[in-house]
Each structure stands twice: as structure tokens, then as C-alpha cells.
Amino acid sequence: MIVTEKAPAKLNLSLDTPMRYFDGSPQWDMVMVSADLADYVTVETHRRPATIKVYTNSGFLPNDQRNLAYQAAHILRSRFHCKDGVTIRIKKQIPVAAGLGGGSSDAAAVLRALNSIWRLGLSLSELAKIALTIDSDVPYCIYNKLAHVTGHGEKIELLPPQPHYWAVIAKQKISVSTPQILRQINYEKLQHLNNEALLTNLKKEDWQEATKYMGNVLEPLTMKFYPEIGRLKNKMKELGADVAQMSGTGPTVFAICHTESRAKRIQNSIRGFCRDVHVVTLL
């Protein structure tokens, strides 16, 4: 049986980390939304050979157990004692190592596909619990809806859908090491966000007021190594973006606009120094 799942990119409307757990991992307090920039993940099961294979159209991704999609298939197959082999084909459109959760979204797509193929009958919340064993972003990617995400990434509160907005997603030709950025966090000096105010306005469906409270506490840490991220963000603001900020640990910067025409204007204006630019809708 063959199933194809859409695996959208995620954006951090807010990203904060209140503390570090005893194991050294950050506690997250984030508001996340998905964007219509997506990979397409085709999953096929077969009796022979009883192996897991991953194929992608990107030379930057591993095709073995280092790939999160591979891990998703392995974990689900082991947990439910399924003996089928699994072939995963990923058509990449989300930039790799960009802070957009592409690998996590691919893994979530594999979990959803195999849940359907093997008729496991797992709810989204049950899939999300399994997803947490793969990576902290995978539980959110099971849902792909506007949500407040806390803890290790396992606590997910879905929020009311927002008006139709456009996003300009731009990735410069730089690579950011997430572990390197997370090691830079000094919790005594971190400038925390007012996520409570952001959530209040999102729940009232007052998007314009909510934009005042969006942000990413990791921006200064990443920009210390890559100041060009700050220059791109400022350029987007100058061009009229409602919001412009970094997603995840970077390097991707996104702008949110209430009209497609403004989003296109920003896209055309920054293409000269940033070729990987997409205009998409928020989901």
C-alpha cells in the first residue's frame, strides 16, 4: 500500500526558553504555525525485503538511521511489531538545516502514513507522544496547526485559526549549528517574551495586536555569529512586513504580510542577495 503525506514547514511566531532541564535540554515556550512550503513524503510498505529505505531528491540529507523519517518508521514498526519493509521517498522543497523543521515534518508525515497503512487507529495525540521520542519538533508537526507548544515539545494547545496571511520565507547561504546556539544561552541575561499577551490576543483573534508580542529570544545569539540575519530582518521590516524574525535557531528569516502584493514586493526586493525566497500562505 502507498500513501503520500504533505509535510509543511513550521515557523516560530514566538520562541522562548524559560529554563534548562536537569538533563541540559531547554524547556520551550513557543507559538508555532505551519506554512504552505512543504515536502511530499510517499510511504510504501512491502513484505520483502523487510528493510527500511529512504530516498530523497536532496544530496544534503542522510538516507540511513540518521534521517528522522527513517527513525519514525523504525520506532513505529518496532512498537507495534510490524514485519513489513518500508520505502520512504521524500520530495524536498523545504530548505535543509534552515530552522523550518523540515526533517521533523517528514518524520511526522511518516508516522501519519504508517498509522493509516497499518490501520493502527492511533489518535493524533497518541502519535504525538510517539513523535516526542524522535525530536522535540515532531509532536507539533503531527498537527501542523497554530499552537502553543511547551515543555520538551510535548504539551500542545491548539489555537483558533487566524485570518489569511502571507509569509515570505528567506534562507541565506549560511548554515547554523543548533547545538552551538543552544550552548550560548545564558538564562540570567535572556530577554524573555510576553507570550501570555501573545496568546491572549491570538485567542481573541486579534492578529494585529498579537504581532506586537511575537519574537525569538535566540535571535541575538545567532546574529552574534551571523549578523547578515539581522540585516535581512531589518530589510524586510523596511519593506513593510507586519512581522519579520528568525525561525528556530536560524538561519531562515520570515516576514508576515496581510496582503500578497506586499509579500511579493518583499520577495522581489531581497532576491538580489538571497536567492532561496518563497512566498506562501500560513496554514
Curated annotation (Swiss-Prot):
Active site: K10, D137
Biological process, per Gene Ontology: isopentenyl diphosphate biosynthetic process, methylerythritol 4-phosphate pathway; terpenoid biosynthetic process
Top EC group: transferase
Keywords: ATP-binding, Isoprene biosynthesis, Kinase, Nucleotide-binding, Transferase
Record pathway: Isoprenoid biosynthesis; isopentenyl diphosphate biosynthesis via DXP pathway; isopentenyl diphosphate from 1-deoxy-D-xylulose 5-phosphate: step 3/6
Its biological purpose: Catalyzes the phosphorylation of the position 2 hydroxy group of 4-diphosphocytidyl-2C-methyl-D-erythritol.
Keyword Manganese: no
Protein name: 4-diphosphocytidyl-2-C-methyl-D-erythritol kinase
Taxonomic classification: Bacteria, Bacillati, Bacillota, Bacilli, Lactobacillales
Keyword set includes Kinase: yes
PANTHER family noted in UniProt: 4-DIPHOSPHOCYTIDYL-2-C-METHYL-D-ERYTHRITOL KINASE, CHLOROPLASTIC
Its EC number(s): 2.7.1.148
GO molecular function ontology, one term from the record: 4-(cytidine 5'-diphospho)-2-C-methyl-D-erythritol kinase activity
Organism: Limosilactobacillus reuteri (strain DSM 20016)
